[in-house]
Amino acid sequence: MKSRQGGFTLLEMLVAIAIFASLSMGAYQVLQGVLTSDEVAKKKEARLSELQLAFTLMERDITQMVPRSGRIDGENNKVLLAASRFGQQSDDWGMAFIRGGWLNPDGMLPRSGLQRVGWRLKDHKLERLSYLYPDPVIGTEPRIQPMLDRVTALRLYFYDKGAWKEEWTQRNVLPYGLAVELDLEDYGTLRRQFLIGAGGQRAENAN
């Protein structure tokens, strides 16, 4: 009598292959889910870092605003804070002013501690404008630094005499505070309020 040979039948092999394929697919889906979640988390972390950097630079600029007007195209415009709709060629609100506190250790660089800066919205990007000197010569183009993308609106508000105002028309005096509102595609409306250290002060070079 012949002894039965050991091993798996074709049906058993097919069943084993099907089970292995099912387990492999499940493991792959779990791995893909983990990788996708990790990628989303990294993108959100990068976005939050961009927001933090933009607001940090904005805070440094605004809080160190000084009551000094600058020359534009060779002429003194006598405006301390130029803030308006479509100002600085913005697609929404834009602003420009002179700030202090621009570090120049031991006077190593051929410039002062004052800097002309501006902020605007262009093509859904929040941009920071800066010049090497507070009174740039005619034809000088600013350095344009993109700070945030996916921005749909930029609004400014000005604090004076205990209230927030939607416009700033005083040429030779600074407001006490400035609020910036950004509409973002992913985070909605964000508002930051900044105290201007030189708020209420008039132009140092008014004459």
Curated annotation (Swiss-Prot):
Gene Ontology cellular-component annotations: plasma membrane; type II protein secretion system complex
**PTM info:** Cleaved by prepilin peptidase.
**Gene3D superfamilies, alphabetized:** GSPII I/J protein-like (3.10.610.10), gspk-gspi-gspj complex like domains (2.10.70.20)
Q: Does the keyword Iron apply?
A: no
Q: Which domain of life is it from?
A: Bacteria
Coarse class of the primary localization is membrane
Keyword line: Cell inner membrane, Cell membrane, Membrane, Methylation, Protein transport, Transmembrane, Transmembrane helix, Transport
Which residues form the propeptide in this entry? 1-7
SUPFAM superfamilies linked to this entry: Pili subunits
Subcellular localization(s) per the UniProt record: Cell inner membrane
Write down the Pfam families for this protein, in alphabetical order: N_methyl, T2SSJ
A biological process (GO) of this protein is: protein secretion by the type II secretion system
- Mark the transmembrane ranges: 8-29
* Topological relation to the membrane, as annotated: Single-pass membrane protein
Spell out which residues are annotated as carrying N-methylphenylalanine. Answer: 8
Subunit structure comment from the entry: Type II secretion is composed of four main components: the outer membrane complex, the inner membrane complex, the cytoplasmic secretion ATPase and the periplasm-spanning pseudopilus. Interacts with core component exeG.
Query: Which family is annotated?
Result: Belongs to the GSP J family.
Function summary: Component of the type II secretion system required for the energy-dependent secretion of extracellular factors such as proteases and toxins from the periplasm. Part of the pseudopilus tip complex that is critical for the recognition and binding of secretion substrates.
Task: Please report the name of this protein according to its UniProt entry.
Answer: Type II secretion system protein J
- Species for this entry: Aeromonas hydrophila
